[in-house]
Amino acid sequence: MVQPIELKLDLPMKLSNAVVSTTAKVWNILVASKRGDLEAVKRSSDECHELLYAQYNYTPPIHFAVREGHYDLVKYLLEQGAHDPKYKIYPFQESLQTIANDRGYNDIESLLNQYAANSSLQKYKGDNGEIHYNRSELQLEFEHAVDKNGYNKVEAILKEYPEFAKDETYFWGEGILLFAAKGNNQKMMELLLSYGAKVPSVLKWAQFYYFERYESAAYLMEKGMNPNVMSWQHVTLLHDMAQKGETQKAELLLKYGADINPVDEEYQSTPLGMAARWGQTEMVEYLISKGADTKKSGAPWSTPLAWARKKGHGQIEKILLKHFK
């Protein structure tokens, strides 16, 4: 798990019930949950109960407790009502029961099902985690001008404050190029790049902004965007493209040197594993043709072949067996 830039800063963060904590404290409880450190989680709860349901990028502590198989911590969080049964992991939109089932955590899956059936236990719901960046009026004006394509205003501000272009915390920590990239506004991107703006290497929403349009993605790759951009869960853009079956964009990433076999934390899978899990037959064939490792994974249950079998993708299973090495 990579600590995002905004969680390295001690910024005010709004939790459930309008309680305000800090990004540092939210990061600490998420890390403790990933480690299965029940006592650390309890200490956070003693300080602020809402931290038990604190979210960064829609992700609360129980997400990590379930994913990493920490039964006692999951049980504690459920006893505290710190789970919304409607929760779906971001961006893959799967339930925690699915995450537990994939890993063979049947006891945890059972706990989640029992909790979901008893609404009286559920104390929290929905999203939280709004971060307050404490920007000056001029910084807000700059961000707004970039968002609304106010080229002349942006240029004028950058002439006086060139350092604004290099601040990666703009637009919720996604970088100042975010909306120019989404709209394929190459004139604005060129201006920002000329003052030192870069696409951050750790992003939450890269596939929905920087790689939404092929033309914009190709432009940024040519300008030096890191082909191994990833989320804080080590999900790279190539993982995202593989999961969605976006072969043209996957080809673009590989052209600029993207690692073809990285393993993410969320599914313990390579891009090939993602493609196999989600039934992307064409992508499976493409990645294999480019030399993807057909065996590599982070766990025995997450190999490409294991995913194809578990999810019932018979054609992909045949392809993998044919190329097994």
Residue ranges, per PLM feature:
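Conserved ankyrin/ankyrin-like repeat signature
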Residues: 40, 72-73, 107-108, 153, ...
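Intrinsically disordered, low-complexity regulatory segments in ankyrin-centric signaling systems
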Residues: 2-47, 67, 79, 110-161, ...
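Ankyrin-repeat boundary/"N-cap" motif
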Residues: 23-29, 54-61, 87-95, 135-142, ...
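Ankyrin-repeat and related helical/solenoid repeat scaffolds used for protein-protein interactions
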Residues: 63-91, 261-310
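Leucine-rich solenoid repeat scaffolds
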Residues: 92-116, 294-325
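Ankyrin repeat domain, specifically the short helix-to-loop turn at the C-terminus of the second helix
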Residues: 43-50, 76-83, 113-117, 158-164, ...
